[in-house]
């Protein structure tokens, strides 16, 4: 007896074999789609976690909150290097960033950019230390006399403390 004849003998209506096969295909397809969606969800979750850890929010001294100063979160601090505030001790550079409303003391360990100087725009990347000082691990200075980072320029213009381009 052939396989089809055996199926028909067990299932006189002849539907069982075909119906089971279609049902199994649908179930298999649903599992594949569900698995692909689960993998996609995990990938998106990992990407968002990585982006969240790498995002560095921009703040001026007047924008800072108590949470910014105590959370240990990394962000970018922007403003102008206050006149008379720069001091060097070995490889440590200390200076004050201001937006003319508030000031923040910054400590940077390393060599500052060539164009770093008092009265110029600066963006420092880092976090606040337990001592209340902003610990920068990267300092960016303007690269010509007309350049101020766009975020910094917009923020300073909103506060009415800068009138540049």
UniProtKB/Swiss-Prot annotation:
SUPFAM superfamilies to which the protein is assigned, alphabetical: Heme chaperone CcmE
Periplasmic compartment segments: 51-165
Molecular functions per Gene Ontology: heme binding; metal ion binding
Location of the protein in the cell: Cell inner membrane
Cytoplasmic side: 1-29
Membrane topology, as annotated: Single-pass type II membrane protein
Keywords (A to Z) from UniProt: Cell inner membrane, Cell membrane, Cytochrome c-type biogenesis, Heme, Iron, Membrane, Metal-binding, Signal-anchor, Transmembrane, Transmembrane helix
GO cellular component, one term: plasma membrane
Chain ranges passing through the membrane: 30-50
Functional summary from the UniProt entry: Heme chaperone required for the biogenesis of c-type cytochromes. Transiently binds heme delivered by CcmC and transfers the heme to apo-cytochromes in a process facilitated by CcmF and CcmH.
Protein name per its UniProtKB record: Cytochrome c-type biogenesis protein CcmE
Native species: Brucella canis (strain ATCC 23365 / NCTC 10854 / RM-666)
């Amino acid at each position: 007896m052939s396989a089809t004849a055996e199926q028909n003998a067990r299932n006189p209506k002849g539907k069982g074999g075909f119906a089971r096969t279609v049902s199994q295909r649908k179930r298999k397809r649903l599992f594949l789609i569900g698995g692909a969606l689960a993998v996609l969800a995990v990938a998106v979750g990992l990407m968002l976690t990585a982006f969240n850890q790498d995002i560095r929010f921009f703040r001026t001294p007047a924008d800072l909150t108590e949470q910014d100063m105590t959370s240990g979160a990394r962000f970018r601090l922007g403003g102008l290097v206050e006149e008379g505030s720069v001091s060097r001790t070995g490889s440590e550079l200390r200076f004050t960033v201001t937006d003319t409303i508030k000031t923040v003391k910054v400590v940077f360990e390393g060599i500052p950019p060539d164009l770093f100087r008092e009265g110029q725009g600066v963006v420092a990347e880092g976090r606040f230390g337990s001592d209340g000082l902003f610990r920068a691990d990267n300092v960016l200075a303007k690269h010509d006399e007309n350049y101020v980072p766009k975020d910094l320029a917009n923020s300073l213009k909103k506060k009415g403390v800068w009138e540049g381009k």
